[in-house]
Amino acid sequence: MKKYYYVLFIIIFSTLSLNAETTNTKLNKLFIQLKECNSQKQSKILENKIWRLWETHPTNFQLTIDLKEGSRLVQNRNYLKAYNIFSKIIDKDPNWAEAWNRRATTLYLMGKHKNALKDIDIVLKLEKRHFGALIGKGQVYMEMKEYEKAYNSFLESSYINPMNSNTMELIP
């Protein structure tokens, strides 16, 4: 019986590991296409594919559901509940960049700019190509009237996603 559980554990672990690896492979391909893209329409399509991968936890479907619930609460301006949900997700998986990103967004909307920047820094340690976090970082710096830092964040985002309409408007 122990052998059965051991084999089952190996199969499950291998599947979860493969799923995370597949997500990274897909992201790498999409980021290459995004950098080479020369139309805003195609850029938006690629961005949406990247966001779908970021928003989907690679191994835990419940965390994906929780992230969506937290995002719904943000849309309804229930920031404290959303913050708590994102914090619980982070407690369960501190390596999921998108949970940190959503919490950073929530902190920004709550007016807690320094805390938002701390979370954004973690997002960027986990996923250095997170153009959304870089744009968010720029927005936080704009609110703090640190315009040079804001510009640099927007510029860095434009290197990753050159055709993003948000950064194209902000960078001359």
Where would I find each of the regions flagged by the language model?
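N-terminal leader/linker segments that initiate helical-solenoid repeat arrays
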Residues: 18-68
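Alpha-helical adaptor scaffolds
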Residues: 60-127, 132
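Boundary/linker segments of alpha-helical solenoid repeat arrays
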Residues: 41-44, 58, 131-132, 161-172
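TPR/TPR-like (Sel1-like) alpha-helical repeat modules
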Residues: 31-38, 142-166, 172
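TPR-repeat structural position
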Residues: 40-43, 79, 113, 147
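Alpha-solenoid helical repeat scaffolds
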Residues: 48-51, 87, 121, 155
